[in-house]
């Protein structure tokens, strides 16, 4: 069974289905196959197939509420979804901006000569990203460079 799950989780849609169920539960909402289908953008038949595999693997449990099937994560399913979210967040980082930031930080440790600090300040101004961690660090470094240029410790 684990080999089937490995293959399944190499598909983006399967991961998105699992994460969508997790997000519903985190928001205090109930997860239904039809709403998952709409949110993930996959046909209901595919969602149903994947949910069947998840249920056989004890990643989700399902029960009928009237004529409507509701799904929820098991403890193992929740753990898997959290791991995938961590991986997804890691992969959404701006690695190029982080590399540039490390280079700038290394250059900044070489003293506070204004001839060296002004290009660093310019690089910090030009570093654009959506990566929140990088944005925060850039702001900290801008402040530090400004203080160094103004003669503050």
Segments predicted by a language model, with ranges:
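Short amphipathic alpha-helical interaction segments
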Residues: 41-56
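Amphipathic alpha-helical dimerization/coiled-coil segments
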Residues: 84-151
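Non-catalytic, well-ordered alpha-helical scaffold segments
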Residues: 12-15, 48, 78, 139
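Short helix-to-turn junction characteristic of helix-turn-helix DNA-binding domains
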Residues: 21-25
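A short, conserved structural fragment
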Residues: 55-65
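Short acidic, hydrophobic short linear motifs in intrinsically disordered regions
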Residues: 27-38
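Short alpha-helical segments that sit at the start of domains
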Residues: 1-20
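Basic, amphipathic "hinge/linker" alpha-helix immediately C-terminal to the N-terminal HTH DNA-binding motif
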Residues: 66-84
């Amino acid at each position: 069974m684990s080999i089937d799950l490995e293959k399944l989780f190499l598909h983006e849609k399967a991961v998105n289905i699992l994460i969508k169920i997790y997000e519903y539960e985190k928001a205090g909402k109930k997860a239904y196959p039809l709403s998952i289908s709409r949110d993930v953008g996959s046909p209901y038949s595919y969602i149903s197939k994947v949910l069947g595999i998840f249920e056989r693997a004890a990643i989700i449990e399902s029960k009928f509420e009237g004529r409507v099937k509701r799904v929820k994560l098991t403890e193992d399913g929740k753990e898997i979804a959290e791991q995938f979210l961590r991986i997804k967040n890691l992969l959404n980082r701006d690695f190029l901006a982080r590399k540039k930031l490390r280079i700038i930080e290394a250059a900044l440790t070489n003293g506070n000569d204004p001839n060296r600090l002004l290009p660093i300040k310019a690089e910090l101004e030009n570093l654009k990203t959506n990566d929140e961690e990088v944005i925060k660090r850039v702001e900290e470094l801008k402040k530090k460079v400004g203080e160094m240029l103004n003669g503050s410790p």
